[in-house]
UniProtKB/Swiss-Prot annotation:
InterPro entries assigned to the protein according to its UniProt record, in alphabetical order: C5-MTase (IPR050750), C5_DNA_meth_AS (IPR018117), C5_MeTfrase (IPR001525), C5_meth_CS (IPR031303), SAM-dependent_MTases_sf (IPR029063)
GO biological process: DNA restriction-modification system; methylation
Protein name: Type II methyltransferase M.Bsp6I
Enzyme Commission (EC) number: 2.1.1.37
Function: A methylase that recognizes the double-stranded sequence 5'-GCNGC-3', methylates C-? on both strands, and protects the DNA from cleavage by the Bsp6I endonuclease.
Active site, per annotation: 73
Domain SAM-dependent MTase C5-type residue range list: 2-315
The gene coding this protein: bsp6IM
Membership in a protein family: Belongs to the class I-like SAM-binding methyltransferase superfamily. C5-methyltransferase family.
Length: 315
């Protein structure tokens, strides 16, 4: 078993993808958000340090083989207004990841971030990251993968995955997974038949834009979004990229038409669209926290496929 340390662990999606292979076990994790930590601890038994990573002392972290880091992407994402390293809140958090890498020298590093990381600041941000990893002894491969093409999950979600090896042979052996057919549909992810809690449904008295929704949402085969002035139908029959602000209502929330009415996705359905298994526990938290956690998370089957290839490359 290869041992994992997980930074910015969130609810544990990256950890879960690695553990599902049967080749890796998480020995230590860190997460700052107290609500995400509640979800993490409902599903994982390993040690979780709930603190700002800047307060973590390297000597307090046990030895491990693989470092996972989904360092916060708000400063690199379109949703986060493209600030990058100047962003005091999260731009410097890559360097906190680097601090642990330099101190602990794991065999493998796995980083996940938004696709925009590559183009941010004319490629300079990514260049800094790439060169920092390389100059500290890692051979790097990276690729942007879409969940619908590489995870058999009907969500349009592109993310960059960066894998680094200290061993040049392992690096040469490693390839990202090949595309695979999408066999799961939106209907596999959502519950169209049951009447759910009233709070998920849009009604005339609760929703100022109810009548255009009613007029334009004609199919139960797809997902819609309210885009400030009009209803957008997703023609590709996959869910649009889930975001951390889904639970706040209004703009961009994925909506479905069911026989019981028009409603937004439930937190569980959002986790389904991230490829979490049915037995993944969602604790009794306010839905806004769970929506945020799902939107900030990763597509677990994509992670699992990359993790399998990492393990095979080290044999």
């Amino acid at each position: 078993m290869l041992q994992i340390a997980s930074l910015f662990a969130g609810v544990g999606g990256i950890d879960l993808g690695f553990e599902q292979t049967g080749y890796f076990e998480t020995v230590w994790a860190n997460e700052y958000d107290k609500n995400a930590a509640i979800t993490y601890q409902s599903n994982f038994k390993n040690k979780l340090i709930i603190d700002d990573i800047r307060n973590i002392k390297v000597e307090d972290v046990p030895d491990f083989d693989v470092l996972l880091s989904g360092f916060p992407c708000t400063s690199f994402s379109v949703a986060g207004y493209r600030k990058g390293f100047e962003d005091e809140k999260s731009g410097d958090l890559f360097f906190e990841t680097l601090r642990l890498i330099v101190a602990k020298k794991p065999q493998v590093i796995f980083l996940e971030n938004v696709k925009n990381l590559v183009g941010h600041d004319n490629g300079n941000t990514f260049k800094v990251i790439y060169e920092a990893l390389e100059s500290n002894g890692y051979h790097i491969k990276y690729q942007v993968l879409n969940a619908k093409d590489f995870g058999n999950i009907p969500q349009n979600r592109e993310r960059i995955y960066i894998v680094g090896f200290r061993n040049i042979e392992h690096y040469k052996n490693f390839n990202f997974p090949m595309p695979q057919p999408l066999t799961l549909t939106i209907k596999d992810m959502i519950n169209l038949s049951d009447k759910l809690d009233d709070r998920f449904y849009y009604t005339e008295d609760k929703c100022s834009f109810y009548s255009p929704l009613q007029e334009q949402m004609t199919s139960d085969e797809t997902i819609y979004q309210w885009r400030r002035k009009y209803v957008r139908e997703n023609k590709s029959n996959v869910c649009p990229t889930l975001t951390a602000n889904m639970g706040t209502g209004g703009h961009n929330v994925p909506l479905v038409k069911t026989k019981h009415g028009i409603r937004k996705l439930t937190p569980r359905e959002c986790f389904n669209f991230q490829g979490y298994p049915e037995d993944f526990i969602l604790p009794e938290l306010a839905p806004t926290h769970l929506y945020k956690q799902a939107g900030n998370s990763v597509v677990v089957p994509v992670i699992r496929r990359i993790a399998e290839n990492i393990y095979k490359s080290m044999l």
